[in-house]
């Protein structure tokens, strides 16, 4: 059997062929549910608003090992820039091309095949295996994993370990696993002024001029030094808008959006307090609202990290590097329940880009890694 026809590749191609742009699922979870049901999983669809979710579980006892992931993908972008149609999975020179190949339908296929192999070899395994799958990870993340977790928490159903299939690898499969993520906090700020004619500035109040010293100081503030697990907290101004577009009108307001990626050395409350103190110090007339996108989390030494390190070394021959860099994932909704969370998936070089692709051999190796992790934890 060639790599192109490995079971993982075949399932990945089937999933990629379904144009499941957020929040659509397009039957991906039904396909996965059929495979899981055949090996003894209880399937529980959870539909919230426009989002399709699935909680699948095999076993009634703890510990509970959970594969977590998403069937939705980001939009394709300019289709004319793709080598092949993004929803017609194609293998070229050992790489599988298609939207979602790396983020994260390749991982989903590897999870399913690894679980099938594990259950066949170990039908009486310890504990339980679960799948938490959503179609709302790439979007507003309102009705996806967070709603499933709320449902599980309400009935006191706990996850012990969660392995998220996000594309964690950097240069080669398994060189990096994510054992934590920074917190994310967004501020939406409006600086108020008085609109007027640029020739009569004494009759107006320019909010851009008023805000400039504040923004300069905000961008230079030192928030913390980070620690051995997290880099220092960073703040980036993401959007600024003011004015009507005309050159002869002083704007009446300036809108600024900024985002913190913060370590465990500070809290969202501390960041908010410092920003609002700075606003008051500059005597600005403002409105501000805050969006909490997720708390920081960290999975330290223990069975999940040990099993993952062992699996990657056994399959690839090299050691992995646990890191907390990068963006957020749905792991941030699982970790607050007390679960230990790691992310392990394909190389992330092409995610969200045109011509997204994954190495075919990597998908088979990823499935082997997942299978060894299951053996280490549930045998």
Curated annotation (Swiss-Prot):
Q: List the disulfide bonds.
A: none
Name the PROSITE patterns for this protein.
ARGE_DAPE_CPG2_2
Keyword Cytoplasm tagged: no
Look up the record and name the pathway of this protein.
Amino-acid biosynthesis; L-lysine biosynthesis via DAP pathway; LL-2,6-diaminopimelate from (S)-tetrahydrodipicolinate (succinylase route): step 3/3
Q: What is its EC number?
A: 3.5.1.18
Q: Which reaction does it catalyse?
A: N-succinyl-(2S,6S)-2,6-diaminopimelate + H2O = (2S,6S)-2,6-diaminopimelate + succinate
How is the cofactor bound, as the UniProt entry phrases it?
Answer: Binds 2 Zn(2+) or Co(2+) ions per subunit.
Give a GO molecular function annotation for the protein. Answer: cobalt ion binding
Subunit record text: Homodimer.
How is this protein named in the record? Succinyl-diaminopimelate desuccinylase
Q: Which gene encodes it?
A: dapE
């Amino acid at each position: 059997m060639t790599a192109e026809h490995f079971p993982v590749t075949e399932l990945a191609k089937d999933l990629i062929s379904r144009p499941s742009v957020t929040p659509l699922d397009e039957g991906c979870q039904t396909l996965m549910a059929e495979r899981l049901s055949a090996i003894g999983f209880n399937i529980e669809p959870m539909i919230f608003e426009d989002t399709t979710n699935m909680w699948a579980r095999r076993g009634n006892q703890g510990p509970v090992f959970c594969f977590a992931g998403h069937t939705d993908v980001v939009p394709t972008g300019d289709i004319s820039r793709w080598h092949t149609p993004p929803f017609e999975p194609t293998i070229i020179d050992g790489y599988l091309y298609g939207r979602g190949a790396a983020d994260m339908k390749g991982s989903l296929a590897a999870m399913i095949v690894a679980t099938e192999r594990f259950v066949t070899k170990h039908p009486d395994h310890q504990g339980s295996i679960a799948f938490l799958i959503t179609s709302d990870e790439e979007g507003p993340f309102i009705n996806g994993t967070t709603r499933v977790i709320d449902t599980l928490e309400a009935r006191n159903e706990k996850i012990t370990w969660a392995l998220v299939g996000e594309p964690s690898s950097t240069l080669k499969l398994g060189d990096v696993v994510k054992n934590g993520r920074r917190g994310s906090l967004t501020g939406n700020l409006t600086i108020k002024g008085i609109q007027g004619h640029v020739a009569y500035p004494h009759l107006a109040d320019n909010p851009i001029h008023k805000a400039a010293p504040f923004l300069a100081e905000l961008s230079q503030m030192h928030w913390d030094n980070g620690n051995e697990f997290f880099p220092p907290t960073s703040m980036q101004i993401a959007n600024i808008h003011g004015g009507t577009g005309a050159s002869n009108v002083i704007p009446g307001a300036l809108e600024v959006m900024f985002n913190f990626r913060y370590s465990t050395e500070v809290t969202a409350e501390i960041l908010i307090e410092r920003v609002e103190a700075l606003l008051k110090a500059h005597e600005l007339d403002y409105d501000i609202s805050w969006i909490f996108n997720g708390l920081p989390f960290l999975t330290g030494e223990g069975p999940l990290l040990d099993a993952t390190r062992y699996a990657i070394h056994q399959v690839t021959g090299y050691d992995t590097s646990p890191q907390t860099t990068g963006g957020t994932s749905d792991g941030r909704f699982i970790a607050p329940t007390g679960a230990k969370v790691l992310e392990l998936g394909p190389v992330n070089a092409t995610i969200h880009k045109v011509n997204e692709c994954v190495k075919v051999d990597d998908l088979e190796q990823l499935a082997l890694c997942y299978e060894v992790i299951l053996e280490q934890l549930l045998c």
